[in-house]
Amino acid sequence: GFSLGRAHETNKESGAVLPVLMLGILILATCSTLLKASEAGPGSLHAPIIMSLIGGLIFGALAQKSRMCFAGGIRDAILMKNFDLLTIIAGLFVVMLIFNLATGRFVLGFNTPGIIAHSNHLWNILGMYAVGFAAVLAGGCPLRQLILAGQGSSDSAVTVLGMFFAAALCHNFGLASSGTAMNAETGELVAGAVTPNGKVACIICIIACFIIAF
């Protein structure tokens, strides 16, 4: 089988690489025009930077103290009958559900303009299966990896950088799926779809996870 092995201490400089890199990207994004940003669509929607930083620090501190992890919560519930982590995730879901209902932003469905989703459920399931499989092998979900990277874990830092790199590959090589949207010219509803390249990439990722695991 596969095992990450025990964590061990290393030099402090390696743990500071990712935080320093993220700080550099923040400075470039706010003080220069070197980095490009979306001017329309979901990628252009974000809170003011100060609010984002404050909210991120608060949520990050809570996630770190509670050891929040989606993969870990399911693992503990199944293997150890411990529902502590799963209770935290369920609580987060309930809070966000109430917030969205109260603000009128709750939408039940997939084929809805403005919602980044599609109704090709087989590939929704396979895509999240690949993510969950990789999270188990890596020792934590993407959120947990981000928290550990902030704590100074160089392994998690490499994982986070890998997620950035993979996101860039998806959007530059036609791997990313499209969400349901309204055609601005005809007014017709255009259903989201999974790209052929994305399907191939998903299958390759699942096969790679099986090879690593066994």
Indicate residue ranges for each PLM-predicted region.
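Membrane-interfacial helix-loop segments of redox and metal-homeostasis proteins
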Residues: 1-214
